Amino acid sequence: MSLEGKIASQGKAEARAFVTNNPLEKPPFEDYILVTQNSDPEISPLLYNAKGIITEVGGLMSHLAVVSREIKIPCITACENSYDELKTGYNLKIDATAKLNSRVGIEYDF
């Protein structure tokens, strides 16, 4: 199965999904790709151990995109329905090696 979004930070990542909007929620596993609805700065504490980020909103200059480029992890923005469709524990694969702001697919399975 797959979803589509825009590349806001380049790179590749493969890990389990951690779906949350709560910056105080503890990740259930060490390696994860953060899936969130928004790009608010409050979610930042969860970024530094994430292998990648997927968000339903935002763009190249959103907070999550800027921070993800600084810490060199892939970030996909404008990924509609990702928060509802993806569940914590799903296996995700991001290949965001194309140019910034181009459309990219996100592969996932249960």
Sequence positions of predicted segments:
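Non-catalytic, soluble scaffold/interaction modules
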Residues: 1-110
